[in-house]
Amino acid sequence: MQGLIHLYCGDGKGKTTAAVGLSVRAAGAGKRVLFAQFLKDGSSSELNVLRALQNVEVACCTQNFGFFKAMDGQTKAAAQKAYSALLEDVMRKSADGVDLFVLDEAVAACNHGLIEEATLIDFLHGRPKALEVVLTGRDPSQHLLDAADYVTEMRKRKHPFERGIAARRGIEF
């Protein structure tokens, strides 16, 4: 079976949730899943479920660099080194019998220069034929849009944050 590329993008809620849902579905069908998370420290609630499933490996950077806008130059350099190493590691692992490879927030990591988009594009074009790949994040480049077989855009119409309601554990993270 030919693996396809999914891109979940947009300013709305649900990109990671959709990727988690597909991961659960794939694991339920006996497929091996590699779920890599960028720009997050691995403490999101949905990862607890993924870690409990057979056939699912979760990879993330254990260091928390904070929000990109608040990073100084030294922190950005450290984040770039850590996320680039994570990308190289998970790309290598994905060739070892993985059926579904999720790169959560890889689009944002590219946009902030924390991983090289060219490296990601080269991987997508040279990946194992049967490997299904999911990318998530806001504002994908035209190169990523062109590489994708599915593009799903989540659009925000209204969000509680606009009324001062903070993100809630178990709902938004």
Outline where the language-model segments fall.
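Phosphate-binding/switch loop-helix module in NTP-utilizing enzymes
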Residues: 70-132
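Conserved nucleotide-binding/hydrolysis micro-motifs of P-loop NTPases
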Residues: 39-42, 64-65, 107-108, 139-142, ...
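Hydrophobic/aromatic ligand-binding patch that stacks against planar heteroaromatic rings
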Residues: 25, 49, 123, 143-144
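Conserved D-loop beta-strand region of ABC ATPase nucleotide-binding domains
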Residues: 136
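Phosphate-binding/switch region of NTP-binding enzymes
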Residues: 139-173
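Short, glycine/charged-enriched secondary-structure capping and boundary segments
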Residues: 22, 48-51, 73, 115-119, ...
